[in-house]
Swiss-Prot record:
Subunit structure: Homotrimer.
Protein name per its UniProtKB record: 2,3,4,5-tetrahydropyridine-2,6-dicarboxylate N-succinyltransferase
Binding positions (substrate): 108, 145
Cross-referenced Pfam families: Hexapep_2, THDPS_N_2
């Protein structure tokens, strides 16, 4: 089946998704399985970056992921602690893998790392005990540290460091138009959250505890410029707050959380400066 035919088949099935069930056979099931297999191998991805820096979301692939929940019945999934099993519709990416398969894949997955089928993990990635949801893409030489969650269909670039306890939001629950995108060479500080389709551009640094959603204001401290939904490249970002409106009784109102760009660094400066130094200002 050609790529265009695959896309058409999945779009048509999604429009009639109320008729799709675990009993569905034939073209629809084959198309969804093919799409998930492409995602799993990194042959396709939910979002792609163009030469102009703009990201295009392949909505049909996201639809394939959603359709898989209607097609797949619940079943036992092996790999739990002490030989225990889980009960779910999405198998483990590592189901049936042996030493040769792991060596060919070229990444490390320490005990406690969970990756669902249709997520792609590139070579030289390190997965500490973490969770990578279906449809996600984690590119080469990225560190996914302990207790990180990489949400459904999230796109993580090369040489990214995602620190302990970070949450990268997904697109499926609640349903989002576009995935969270972390471009190459970014650093996401511990316990930060990036959700609701926010794009973190190349080389940006988020300090510990930065929370970014689609409506979060990201304010450049030097220029006063306000960004929403996107962190500019090579920005160093820390948590902040905006003063609230006065209450009706005249007293100061509650402040509103925001994020603050405290400085910008170019690639040359970044190569000579440690992450910790960038965060000190």
């Amino acid at each position: 089946m050609s790529l265009s035919a695959l896309e058409t088949s999945i779009n048509t099935a999604f429009d009639a998704r109320d008729t799709v069930s675990t009993a569905t056979k034939g073209e629809v099931r084959d198309a969804v399985e093919h799409a998930l297999d492409m995602l799993d191998k990194g042959e396709a991805r939910v979002a792609e970056r163009g030469d102009d820096g703009k990201w295009t979301v392949n909505q049909w692939l996201k639809k394939a992921v959603l359709l898989s929940f209607r097609l797949n019945d619940m079943s036992t999934i092996s790999g739990g602690p002490g030989g225990a099993t889980w009960w779910d519709k999405v198998p483990s990416k590592f189901s049936g893998w042996g030493e040769n398969r792991f060596r060919d894949a070229g990444f490390r997955a320490v005990p406690g790392a969970i990756v669902r089928r249709s997520a792609f993990i590139a070579k030289n990635v390190v997965l500490m005990p973490s969770f990578v949801n279906l449809g996600a893409y984690v590119d080469e030489a990225t560190m996914v540290d302990t207790w990180v969650t990489v949400g459904s269909c999230a796109q993580i670039g090369k040489r990214v460091h995602i620190s302990g306890g970070v949450g990268i939001g997904g697109v499926l629950e609640p349903l989002q138009a576009g995935p969270v995108i972390i471009e190459d060479d970014c650093f996401i500080g511990a316990r930060s959250e990036v959700a609701e389709g926010v794009i973190v551009r190349r080389g940006a640094v988020l300090s510990m505890g930065v929370f970014l959603g689609a409506s979060t204001k990201i304010i450049d401290r030097d220029s006063g410029e306000i960004f929403v939904g996107e962190v500019p490249e090579y920005s160093v970002v820390v948590p902040g707050n905006l003063p609230g409106r006065p209450l009706k009784n005249g007293q100061p109102g509650p402040s509103t959380a925001c994020a603050v760009i405290v400085k910008r660094v170019d690639e040359r400066t970044r190569s000579k400066t440690s992450i910790n130094e960038l965060l000190r200002d």
